[in-house]
């Protein structure tokens, strides 16, 4: 295993470990929130405040761990690109050397075999290039355009929108839209006098 590959393994392991720690902190945050609810229900405001502080701290801890995991994952993706492209370059160099020998001897069978390898190697390069372009375009939130992040958040919110709206309606008292009430009819003395005059 080369130094690059060893570093890549360590980075991937670190990112995975940090992600697990982030999930653990998020789970602990939810537990602290439940404690807050119970403390408030029992009327223990001071204890609820302590649990709330713990929940906020765990939330921030989870977020920081997730950010660091994302940054490491971004670096490992770039390192994966270097490892893969180096391997492809080495294979291409071997094919080129084989082609030089084939051309010098003008051995048609050897030339045909080398060309087969050459074309296959280019196919591998195209596949790897496509993969790397995709990976480099979306490896981490650090490099992701803000509008993409906003769009993803909106999509997730839309998917959970029904449940979220129901919860909001249950917990919040939203004033109903004001509907204008028709004004009470006001008698016009002059109009009434005219109507009576017409009838007589």
UniProtKB/Swiss-Prot annotation:
Keywords: Endosome, Membrane, Protein transport, Transport
Entry annotated with the keyword Protein transport: yes
Main location: membrane
One GO CC term on file: nuclear envelope
Gene3D superfamilies in the record: 6.10.140.1230
Membrane topology qualifier: Peripheral membrane protein
InterPro entries referenced in this protein's UniProt entry, alphabetically: Snf7_fam (IPR005024)
One of the GO biological process terms: late endosome to vacuole transport
Functional summary from the UniProt entry: Class E VPS protein implicated in concentration and sorting of cargo proteins of the multivesicular body (MVB) for incorporation into intralumenal vesicles. The lumenal sequestrated membrane proteins will be targeted into the vacuole after fusion of the endosome with the vacuole.
Subunit record text: Homodimer.
Family designation: Belongs to the SNF7 family.
Official protein name in the record: Vacuolar protein-sorting-associated protein 46
Species this protein is from: Schizosaccharomyces pombe (strain 972 / ATCC 24843)
Gene this chain is encoded by: did2
């Amino acid at each position: 295993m080369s130094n690059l590959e060893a570093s890549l393994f360590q980075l991937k392991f670190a990112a995975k470990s940090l992600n697990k720690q982030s999930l653990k902190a998020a789970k602990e945050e939810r537990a602290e929130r439940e404690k807050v609810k119970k403390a408030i229900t029992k009327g223990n405001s001071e204890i609820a405040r302590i649990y709330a502080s713990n929940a906020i701290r765990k939330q921030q801890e989870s977020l920081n761990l997730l950010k660091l995991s994302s940054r490491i994952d971004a670096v490992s993706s770039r390192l994966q690109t270097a490892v893969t492209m180096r391997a492809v370059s080495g294979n291409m160099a071997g094919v080129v050397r084989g082609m030089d020998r084939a051309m010098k001897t003008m051995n048609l069978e050897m030339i045909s075999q080398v060309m087969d390898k050459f074309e296959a190697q280019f196919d591998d390069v195209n596949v790897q290039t496509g993969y790397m372009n995709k990976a480099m375009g979306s490896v981490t939130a650090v490099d992701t355009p803000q509008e993409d992040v906003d769009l993803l958040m909106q999509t997730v919110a839309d998917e959970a929108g029904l449940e979220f709206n129901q919860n909001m309606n249950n917990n919040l008292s939203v004033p109903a839209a004001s509907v204008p009430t028709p004004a009470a009819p006001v008698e016009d003395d002059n109009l009434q006098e005219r109507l009576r005059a017409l009838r007589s």
